[in-house]
Amino acid sequence: MDFSVLLEEIKQADTITIFRHVSPDCDAVGSQFALKNWIEENFEGKHVYACGKEVTHQAEWPDNDKVSDDIIASSIAIVLDTANKQRVDDERFAQALRIIKVDHHPDREPFGDICLINDSAAATCEILTFFFDTYKEYVFSQKTAEYLYRGLLTDSLNYTTNNTTQETLKAGGILASTGLDLSKISHDVFDNSIRGFKFTGYIISHTEVLDNAFAYVIIDEETYTSYGLNASDARSFVGKLSNVRDFSVYAVFTTKKDASGKTLYDGSLRSKKNRINDIAEKFGGGGHACAAGVKNLTQENMTNILNLLRKRI
């Protein structure tokens, strides 16, 4: 991948705003804060902002920056780990002078002035690792590397996803060479709290299993909030179903109410082998071939999507 255009845009900009997707995971925030830190460490005087409204509670992260409309309008916006513009966690990114998209999702909805896409990468953090490593004249600090390693580790599920390649492992090696405490980082991002442990028990005891191969659970708002979780955190527990050998397709759905009080469903969908992102796309969602998401499903949508997922086992 030719990173020269991205580097040149960063060099020329006085103000840079960095965005990522809604319901952020460690790859989204890891790539965001890694890029911010790398720019700040190498380009003194630039104004760099990490934008977004939502947070993830998987590991500890810096706070997002509070940014005015005027700042965004005078910036270049770099949008990370976001397949389509509807999923950017702050619609004001569109006000920027220029928009650069850096992503590892299939580019089914290109947006922005510049798109740097590598959909064979296991994580956007993998892409940025090679970007930073390409230009060895710049500082690539351990702090930047740790942000990236968190995202790489979680999006590849500890190097177990089917899009983990030798390039993914090479990226991990580059990051490890900065002196990271790999064991500590792994525990930080994967270990459960007591609440998380109890919530895992809830998921296991309430999972529906069809044909001994398709597993799903629907978690209502009252339940996940009682464990101190938001909806995004609750859906991130979808990985707990991956350890069952017989489950080839699995999903976690959370409920919410719209303005009229109607129940809607958001879901995290996973498959060990067969493609499912085309199913997500039928309902306005998307993602990777074997890891996708959907939002704002009606009860009728739920019936349909469960039937379609069941057919992919």
Describe the function of each predicted region:
Residues 1-5, 80-81, 132-134:
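Short, motif-level signal for alpha-helix interfacial/capping segments enriched in acidic residues
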